[in-house]
Amino acid sequence: MRHMPTITEVMTAFPVHVEESTPLAEALDLMKEHQCHHLPVMGGKQVVGLLSGEDIKLAQSPGHEDQDFEELVAGDLCRRRFAKVDLHTRLDIVLTGMGEEGLNAVIVMKNEKLAGILTTHDACRFFSRWLKKEYLPDDDPGIA
């Protein structure tokens, strides 16, 4: 029987995160610096929200109700309703749930503490590696 990959093999462990009071411009700079699209938002030691690059882009768009982008902080725009899963949840269950709910990220918790984040980007990278391993010979010149 083959091994079911665990969420820990796919997720981004110890993700970059921000406090609720972090200015959006700073959050956007962190996303660029770390090449990520989602940031867990913390209120002390608790995850209180999830901020995405799309949320920030929307706030920067003309006609957005919050016109003064420079005054906004992560807590103003983060989604307060977000999916979180336990570190020991099977990967297939998490991915199925993400697909059914149309989620592009879930927060991964261990003992009520932030342990990681699993995004569609993480899943695609993992699946790509798996496909190459399963279906391409080791001597394939197309493998980088």
What kind of feature is each model-predicted range?
Residues 17-35, 42, 84-102, 108-110, ...:
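The conserved cystathionine-beta-synthase
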Residues 73, 104-105:
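C-terminal basic regulatory modules in eukaryotic proteins
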Residues 31-34, 39-55, 98, 106-122:
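A glycine-centered beta-loop-beta connector
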Residues 1-14, 52-84, 88-99, 114, ...:
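Tandem CBS (Bateman) regulatory domains
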